[in-house]
């Protein structure tokens, strides 16, 4: 990309220099040509022969002016050499054109130099592939058949737009990577209209623990409010934001006092949105890392059972949502990786522990749909490749610890950083040695 910009700037610089030189020369050439075209009138050539007549004529005019009323008439050289008005106007116009063109050329040169200086001052960034690249499949261990593109794994419908792979480093957990959809920017839908399994979608929330605003958090709010409106339930964005913030702050206080334990409240008694709410904290925020680097409330995960009136598409297989907060990308690598791992432990731990509750035993969560956490507004200066590696390490740690037996579904992200990170972990994975 930098080479392309450098070629463009060089072309602009050369064009500006050439334009300035040409306009300066053009202005002087126009002035000279106009000067050469100004010729004396035909009567001037015979001025020496008619000099006597002219003197006599002036004498008569002087005598008439002496005896005439009013001020004497003035004479100028224009009486002998009349100036051509069209030639003078053309000369002035050409001078203006030359000055304007010269100024434009100088402006182009200065703009090119300014852009070149700004480009050199910016730090280099990691290139991001604009399209979804074909990536080789992980090598399956002996005795295990490796899935191919033409033959997806058993039980996976042959639908274009996603890829499902089992990963040995994740205890053969199936991971689905969605391709671009027909929606704006190719984003994956939060929930499917007719799902074949119960999916809990992760909301990449904010440090203040409310649902709403922009990005994915705002999309969750719009989905809930639209379902409420369809069922004639009065619910505004402000009310949803305040209600979700109050419930999640209350849950967080309980979860921080009992890390590693799923806490719950019967939110259905006072909430228009949530029938039941849970929270899980694997590592208490701000104990292992500094919140001034990562942001507040990182590592906490909230699991909500939505009421039927606000469930997406009105399908009860879509009535579970997860809410978490990703670390800020500008944090140091050590703090970022620890906080990211705690975030993934919170997500997988919350689902694993929920499936052991009476609610989960009746209607367990079968899949977790999540974005590449931290790749949006919280990304900062961190490259997507770095986020993909942190995600792979965190997912591997969470699956190894909880073994939730659920499918992971990564939403579409153009760089495929989640897929690349897990493929790298799969290549470097070492099989545990038997006794």
Curated annotation (Swiss-Prot):
Keywords: Membrane, Signal, Tachyzoite, Transmembrane, Transmembrane helix. GO terms for cellular component: membrane; symbiont-containing vacuole membrane. It comes from the Eukaryota. It is found in: Parasitophorous vacuole membrane. The chain crosses the membrane at residues 97-117. Residues 118-435 are cytoplasmic. Residues 1-20 form the signal peptide. The keyword Signal applies. Residues 21-96 are vacuolar. During host cell infection by tachyzoites, does not play a role in tethering the parasitophorous vacuole to the host mitochondria, probably because it does not bind host mitochondrial import protein TOMM70. This is Mitochondrial association factor 1 form a1. It comes from Toxoplasma gondii (strain ATCC 50611 / Me49). The lineage of its organism: Eukaryota, Sar, Alveolata, Apicomplexa, Conoidasida. The gene is MAF1a1.
